[in-house]
Amino acid sequence: MASTALSTASNPTQLCRTRASSLCKPVKGLGFGRERIPRNITCMAGSISADRVPDMSKRELMNLLLLGAISLPTFGMLVPYGSFLVPAGSGSNAGGVAAKDKLGNDILVEDWLKTHGPNDRTLAQGLKGDPTYLVVESDKTLATYGINAVCTHLGCVVPWNAAENKFLCPCHGSQYNNQGKVVRGPAPLSLALVHADVDDGKVVFVPWVETDFRTGDNPWWK
């Protein structure tokens, strides 16, 4: 009896490992039941190289991206056990979540302000695992809003450039002012906002559903 063998060369979609995860798609080749022909594989990088991001170490960026990547697929599995796994008080502010630093620890506002000066913008883990900037005001207080770091063009993480007092996207050149309002395309919209509340000394990110104070418009991210 004849048997049919499944070759990995006939798999229509393959994954490869690079510095940034990439999706590899075959450019040429035949399907099942035909003569095998060597395939050319084209890898299209799905994210940018960390060494192109200014004012932020590679380790910090990769830690935050890894946290976000891990949190999304595991969240659904953990929901039924959330009351056992989430510390008391976490996420109690109308759908809010405790802000996490690059090591995954809760951010204590008093300690944060001791190590982050005026006009600082530093990434934390925010709602849905998105990298989100905590903002320190010029008077050394924590701003009541945080800024989602995901570019509204194609989803790159946008670094803060203190020298230019702007968020500058390294992917396609979009620019945002120091509050995350878009000032140069191709990004069509400003960076999303979240509330940065303080609960029992910890920073808590809460969804922003009110008018965007930067534009006077309803929030596009609702």
From Swiss-Prot:
This is Cytochrome b6-f complex iron-sulfur subunit, chloroplastic. The 4 large subunits of the cytochrome b6-f complex are cytochrome b6, subunit IV (17 kDa polypeptide, petD), cytochrome f and the Rieske protein, while the 4 small subunits are petG, petL, petM and petN. The complex functions as a dimer. Its EC number is 7.1.1.6. The chain crosses the membrane at residues 66-86. SUPFAM superfamilies: ISP domain. [2Fe-2S] cluster binds at residues 151, 153, 169, 172. GO terms for cellular component: chloroplast; chloroplast thylakoid membrane; plasma membrane. Its cofactor is [2Fe-2S] cluster. Belongs to the Rieske iron-sulfur protein family. This protein is 1 of 2 subunits of the cytochrome b6-f complex that are encoded in the nucleus. The Rieske iron-sulfur protein is a high potential 2Fe-2S protein. Component of the cytochrome b6-f complex, which mediates electron transfer between photosystem II (PSII) and photosystem I (PSI), cyclic electron flow around PSI, and state transitions. The gene is petC. It is a single-pass membrane protein. PROSITE patterns: RIESKE (PS51296). It comes from the Eukaryota. Residues 109-205 form the Rieske domain. Keywords: 2Fe-2S, Chloroplast, Disulfide bond, Electron transport, Iron, Iron-sulfur, Membrane, Metal-binding, Plastid, Thylakoid, Transit peptide, Translocase, Transmembrane, Transmembrane helix, Transport. Residues 1-49 form a transit peptide. One of its GO terms (molecular function) is plastoquinol--plastocyanin reductase activity. PANTHER family: CYTOCHROME B-C1 COMPLEX SUBUNIT RIESKE, MITOCHONDRIAL. HAMAP family: Cytb6_f_Rieske. Binds 1 [2Fe-2S] cluster per subunit. Pfam families: Rieske, TM_PetC.
